[in-house]
Curated annotation (Swiss-Prot):
Residues reported in the UniProt entry to bind Mg(2+) 1: 76, 220
Protein name from the UniProt record: RIO-type serine/threonine-protein kinase Rio2
Residues at the active site: 202
Root EC class: transferase
Originating species: Methanocaldococcus jannaschii (strain ATCC 43067 / DSM 2661 / JAL-1 / JCM 10045 / NBRC 100440)
InterPro entries (UniProt xref): Kinase-like_dom_sf (IPR011009), Prot_kinase_dom (IPR000719), Rio2 (IPR030484), RIO2_wHTH_N (IPR015285), RIO_dom (IPR018934), RIO_kinase (IPR000687), RIO_kinase_CS (IPR018935), WH-like_DNA-bd_sf (IPR036388)
Domain Protein kinase: 65-270
Ligand binding (Mg(2+) 2): 207, 220
SUPFAM superfamilies in the cross-refs: Protein kinase-like (PK-like) (SSF56112), Winged helix' DNA-binding domain (SSF46785)
Cofactor: Mg(2+)
Reaction(s) catalysed (UniProt annotation): L-seryl-[protein] + ATP = O-phospho-L-seryl-[protein] + ADP + H(+); L-threonyl-[protein] + ATP = O-phospho-L-threonyl-[protein] + ADP + H(+)
GO MF: ATP binding; metal ion binding; protein kinase activity; protein serine kinase activity; protein serine/threonine kinase activity
Disulfide topology: none
């Protein structure tokens, strides 16, 4: 999978160390259930099959007990509620990258820059691994989901509660002073992440979740870049601007001259 989208039958037979007729029988059944797909070039694991492999690995490790409802479908994956073997509720995120995401990834993500002839499933695995590693470095200092386990293209994270800022009208339940306080709390988390060594790189109202108690969590970190990245200033200033842009509709910037991209950039990086 790392080197092919389609694996030739003879290679599968060689790896399986089984008679060809037995391999074909099993491949036919896997294809029937949608776990593999077939073409004139060979066979490939389907996204559903890759999901099943990751789920099976979590179950065999004694981590996962049950999968619940789908919470949503994001730009880069599907998210489900899950029940862990220790009784905790958590979140299961499957990274799923098509050709468009991969093209974007090769252009912007350093950890994919030297990967050329690899499958889309392997790209999904790399991004999941990358996000898990970053969350491990940020949690619990930064308000991010707790990383629990990773396998293939899937990550199990601590339960996340809240709504995207995009879906909320903060003025309905917060005063202007509380809204301004929330803005600066988000900036503080951006600063903490920077001090650890990372810039989110795609921060916006779509990946900041706010709960009913006014607490928040920042999600979606696979595209994060190190603070020593050649384009670090561009990404950090873009993140800052995206947060300012969202809060501008509440006019908090009119009363606080510190709410400025360059001033906040200097504050974060000093």
């Amino acid at each position: 999978m790392r080197h092919h989208e389609w694996v030739p039958l003879d290679e599968i037979v060689r790896k399986a160390k089984m008679p060809e007729k037995d391999v074909l029988y099993r491949l036919k059944r896997l294809n029937k259930f949608g776990f593999v797909v077939r073409s004139t070039y060979g066979y490939a694991v389907s996204m559903g099959g890759y999901d099943a492999l990751a789920i099976n690995a979590f179950v065999k490790k004694g981590i996962l007990k049950a999968i619940g409802n789908k919470l949503g479908v994001g730009k880069e994956g599907d998210v489900y509620t899950v029940l862990l073997s220790d009784g905790r509720e958590a979140v299961l995120k499957f990274h799923k990258h098509g050709r468009t995401c991969f093209t974007r990834g090769k252009r912007y993500r350093g950890y994919l820059a030297d990967k050329h002839h690899i499958s889309w499933l392997y790209v999904s695995r790399l991004t999941a691994e990358r996000e898990f590693e970053i969350l491990n470095e940020l949690f619990p200092i930064v308000k991010v989901p707790e990383p629990i386990e990773w396998n293939r293209h899937a990550i199990i994270m601590g339960k996340v509660v809240g709504e995207e800022l995009k879906r909320l009208d903060l003025s309905e339940f917060m005063s202007k002073e509380e809204i301004k306080d929330l803005f600066w709390k988000i900036i503080e988390e951006v600063k903490k992440a920077y001090e650890i060594g990372y810039i989110h790189g795609d921060l916006s109202e779509f990946n900041i979740l706010l709960d009913e108690n006014g607490d928040f969590v920042i999600i979606d970190w696979p595209q994060a870049v190190p603070k020593y990245h050649p384009d670090a200033e561009f990404y950090l200033k873009r993140d800052i601007w995206n947060v300012i842009r969202y809060f501008k509709k509440y006019k908090i910037d009119k009363e606080d001259e510190k709410i400025d991209v360059d001033k906040i950039f200097e504050y974060i990086t000093k």
